[in-house]
Amino acid sequence: MKKHNIFAAVLSALLAAVSGCKSVPKSAVRVDPLLLLDNESSFYLRIPSSADEKLISRVVQGAVKGISESDARLISSRIDVVYAGLNKKRTKTDYQIAAFCDFPKAAVSKAFSRKNGWTKDSLLLNDGDGNPVEYGIYSDGRILASFPEQMTACVGRNVPSMVETYHNAYYNLSPSASVLDENIYSWLCFDSENPDGKIKYYASKPQSFLTMLTGAVLNFNLVYVRGSIESDPKRDDQFVMDFEFEFRDKKFVPAARGSLAVAFGLTDSDVYLETPTHLVVSNIKISKEQLYNILVL
C-alpha cells in the first residue's frame, strides 16, 4: 500500500467533520493507547506533538496527498501522541497505529458515514457483568479504524484485536490486557504529567531499520536498536539522535563501532560501552528534512 493510502482516507474524512467543531474539554484517557499495539511489528515509534511543532503536521501532509498546510495543522492540533508499529515489505508497509487524540463522537459518526464511503461493523463485547458493550469498526475496503473513546484512535492492522485489548484493560477483564512486549512498552511509554518531549523508537528487528536509516547493509547480530530524537537547541533545522545497540555477542562490537562511524560520521558524537554488549551512541546530528522523509509514514 502506498504511504498516502495509510492515513489519507481516515484524515480526509475527519477533516470535514472536525473543521466545524469546537474543541471539546479533554477528560482523562482511560486506557493508554500504547497498550493497544501488538508484537507483530518490527519497528515501533512514538511521536509526541511536543517533540517538534511541525512533525505531526508533516506526518499528516505526507499521508494525505494534496492536503493544505492549514488543514494539516487542524488535524494535527487534535493529536497529542502517535504510537506506530510497522513492517516494511517489498511492495507495501504494514501499519498499526494507536493515538492520543480528541475526535468527538459526533465528528466520528459524521466523518465515517456510508455517504463518505465507509461501512460500520459492530463489535460486541461483554463487560464482565453480562452487559454488552458496542464498539464501531469502520472500513473503506482498505483501512480499518475505530475510536473506542473520544481520546483514543486505532488505525490499520488488527483493529478489532486492538479494540478488544482496550476493552479488556478498561473493564479489568484480564491481568495483563496488553500483548506488547514489556521492554518495548517501557521504552516508548509517555508520561503526560512529566513529558520528555522526545520522539522514541524501538527496532525489534534492527537490521532492516539500520538499512532504512543508513542505506547500507549492516549486519551486527543485534538484539535490538532503540533510541530517542529531539530538536537541536542550537539549530532550528536539525535533530539530535541517540542510539542504543544491544548485541548478542560482544565480539561484534568493534566492527560495529567502525561501521557506524562511517555511516553516521561520529566526529562530534559520544560513543561508549554501557555493558560489554550494549553500545550507546549519542549526539548524532541529522537534518529535520532528512528525518521527516524517514519518519513520515
Regions found by a protein language model. Give the residues of each.
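Bacterial signal peptide processing site
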Residues: K22-V24
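Hydrophobic helical h-region of N-terminal Sec-dependent signal peptides
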Residues: L11-L15
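An internal, short helix-loop-strand segment that often contains or flanks glycine-aspartate motifs
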Residues: A28, D32-V82, D121-G141, S146-D237
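Bacterial N-terminal signal peptides that target proteins for export
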Residues: M1-A8
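A short acidic-to-branched-hydrophobic micro-motif
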Residues: V81-F103, E230-D249
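Leucine-rich, highly hydrophobic segment in Treponema pallidum outer-membrane-associated proteins
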Residues: D196-L297
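C-terminal motif of bacterial Sec signal peptides marking the signal peptidase cleavage site
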Residues: V18-G20
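Short Gly/Thr-rich strand-loop-strand
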Residues: A106-Q150, V262-H278
